[in-house]
Amino acid sequence: EDFGIEFENGLMDEYRSCHNKCIFCFIDQMPKGMRDTLYFKDDDSRLSFLQGNYVTLTNMSDHDVNRIIRYHLEPINISFQTMNPELRCKMLNNRFAGDALKKVDAFYEAGIVMNGQIVLCKGINDGEELEFSIRELTKYHPYLESVSVVPVGLSKYREGLYPLEPFTKEDAKKVLAMIHKWQK
């Protein structure tokens, strides 16, 4: 039954914005002149279990981690990109991005259900790097329930951004063949 109370947003306070400068950020690739809310980069763990958003863990404090564990707020959807800490720092343009992966260990040890995502960038986190990441992520089974591997989306509005190449049909076939080896 409706309590008759309405909140302006589901968080009841301010959304947390992203402090990364990812080389693949889709918001940086949007055309100018759209509504302001489309340009907001969220990285808020509360939106992960409430709305299914993916978070990088770089904006998450120890207090946030402990709260997720204490209240069993799950699933948490994590945008991994890679399990190579140095490469993750490069891809997210955040020197703390590699250390943020340690939070996954805390979630695993507490039995928190997780889902993962890897935004695949050609020549950066594909090939052997992707193989390594998937192998590392299997260590979090059964609490890491899924890992989505999605090719980077590229728009025509990339001037001044990190140079990324689109995947060709042949590239995609190779990636899929490698991923299929890991599927159960």
Show the residue positions of the predicted features.
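Positively charged, polyanion-binding regions of nucleic-acid-associated proteins
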Residues: V150
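Conserved Radical SAM active-site core
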Residues: D2-Y143, G153-K181
